[in-house]
Each structure stands twice: as C-alpha cells, then as structure tokens.
C-alpha cells in the first residue's frame, strides 16, 4: 500500500475576510484602551480614599475622567458649525474652547468634537473660565453653573444678584454679589463648591469689576471701583486665600480695562490712560 503525503489546502483570504479581520483587531484595540482607562480611574479612586484627600481628589478625578473621555473621542476635524449664531464670548480651556451665545453655550475640542452643550435661557449670560472648568452665570439673576469640559458639576443659587465670577486653575470659584450691609460681597469657594472665605466690601473699597486668580490658585487680584471726592477711583487689591486679609496694591483715577498674571509674582493691568502698569 502506498501512502501519499497530503498537503493542507492553502487558504485564500478574500478582500472581505481581510477587512473583517482588521475591524476585529480595531475592536480589540478599543477594548484594551477602555480597560486601561477604567483601571486608571479605579486606581485614582483607591489612592484618593487611601490618602484621605477625598475632596480635592474627587475634583481631580473628574478632570481626569474628562481628559480620558476627550482623548477617546474620534477627531471630527474642521470646519464645524458650532450652532452659536451670534458669539458673545469665547474662552480657552485645556484641550478645548467654550463659545457663549445669547441662549446657549457650547464646548468643542481642539480636534472638532462637540463635548458639551448648555441651553441656559439667561437674560445676561457671561462666562468665567479656568483651566479645565468654567462658570456660566446670569448677570441679572442669581444662578450660576459650574461646568467641566463635558458635563455639569454644580448649580448654585446665590442669595443676592450676581455681578462677577472668576475661576482658578485648580477649580476654585470666586463670586461677587450685591450685599445689604455693604456695597458688595466677594465669596471664594473650593473646587467642591464649599465656601472658603468671604469679604464684604465697603463703599470706600468699591465694587469689583475685574478678578483674576494667580497661576498657583492661592491668590486673587481684585480691581474694585468707587468714588472719592467726586472722582472715580479704581482700587487694586491682592487677596491671599490662606489669610483672607486683602492688601491694597494700587489706587488710580482710571478704570482697569484688563489684568492678567504674567508669572506667579507679576500682575499686569491696562487702563485708558498711559498709566498702564505692573505690580508684583
């Protein structure tokens, strides 16, 4: 009896078969990415509770969730119709930007993906932005919304009408409202919206028109307007958040139109006259 060696038949992969295998590999890669992201979030939560830094760590964990969610979204590309017909304000966040219109605001990633959409219905909407979150508030009302890049974090109603808001890089929020006993009240909240300090401004100190947190989120620059001997005066204060006692840095007979921190110790401000300046 003769034995013949049998060769296994060669498998011819059709184009459809190749495409199917490639799609399967892509699904596997996406599952691995999701499992890795879930593991990172779980480890972050374990570390937060193990170290006892729950309050601060929860805020950081929410920012981490946002960053992972944004990274996993497909790149939509540009141009895009953002749905804001009349732009009132534009602010930059980490990896994205937020646009404010008359009736709504929208957040888009730098790669063209829509991340968040808020229909506010506020009569006089305004934005204040930090690094990874922003505040949408009503300047003729008493409601504000703290938003991350992808979702609502907190909604707060103040006792008196809102004048101004500011957001620190680490998520702290400062608000200026009307006040019965004084001309205004400035309140600073932690990233979890727990009140940290308050300052009742007198008529001599003025009403804040500009606020800017320092890069380290530990100090707040405040430009407040008042009247002295029939003249308009702007007082520039520095408020250390760990002490709560405002320090008067400068006083001038002009509005401060803009101010910002050039570094951790240098604050730049501009006014209509040639007396623009910097202080440290």
Task: Go through each PLM region and give its residues.
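N-terminal Lys/Arg-rich, disordered targeting/topogenic segments
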Residues: 1-32
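Hydrophobic membrane-insertion alpha-helices, especially the h-region
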Residues: 36-51
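A short beta-strand motif characteristic of beta-propeller blades
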Residues: 72-81, 113-118, 151-157, 195-201, ...
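Beta-strand-rich domains and repeat architectures in extracellular enzymes and scaffolds
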Residues: 75-103, 119-127
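Repeated scaffold domains used in trafficking and secretory/extracellular systems
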Residues: 84-89, 122-129, 160-167, 206-212, ...
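Hydrophobic beta-strand positions that form the internal "hydrophobic ladder"
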Residues: 97, 134, 173-174, 220, ...
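Structural motif
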Residues: 143-145, 182-187, 229-237, 275
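Conserved small/polar residues in nucleotide/adenosyl-binding loops
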Residues: 269-278
């Amino acid at each position: 009896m003769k034995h013949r060696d049998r060769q296994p038949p060669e498998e011819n992969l059709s184009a459809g078969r190749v495409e199917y295998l490639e799609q399967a590999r892509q699904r596997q890669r996406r599952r691995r990415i999701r499992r890795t992201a879930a593991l990172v979030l779980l480890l972050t939560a374990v570390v937060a509770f193990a170290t006892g830094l729950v309050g601060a760590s929860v805020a950081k964990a929410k920012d981490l969730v946002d960053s992972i969610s944004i990274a996993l979204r497909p790149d939509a590309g540009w141009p895009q119709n953002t749905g804001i017909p009349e732009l009132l304000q534009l602010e930059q966040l980490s990896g994205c930007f937020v646009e404010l219109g008359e009736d709504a605001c929208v957040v888009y990633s730098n790669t063209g993906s829509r991340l968040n959409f808020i229909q506010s219905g506020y009569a006089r909407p305004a934005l204040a932005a930090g690094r990874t979150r922003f505040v949408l508030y009503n300047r003729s009302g008493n409601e504000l919304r703290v938003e991350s890049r992808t979702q609502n974090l907190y909604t707060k109603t103040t006792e008196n009408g809102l004048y101004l808001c500011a957001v620190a890089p680490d998520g702290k929020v400062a608000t200026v409202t009307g006040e019965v006993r004084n001309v205004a009240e400035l309140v600073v909240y932690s990233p979890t919206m727990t009140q940290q300090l308050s300052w009742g401004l007198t008529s001599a100190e003025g009403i804040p028109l500009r606020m800017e947190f320092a890069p380290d989120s530990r100090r707040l620059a405040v430009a407040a307007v008042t009247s002295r001997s029939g003249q308009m005066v702007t007082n520039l204060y520095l408020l250390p958040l760990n002490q709560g006692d405002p320090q008067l840095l400068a006083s001038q007979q002009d509005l401060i139109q803009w101010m910002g921190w050039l570094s951790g110790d240098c604050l730049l401000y501009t006014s209509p006259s040639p007396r623009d300046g910097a202080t440290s």
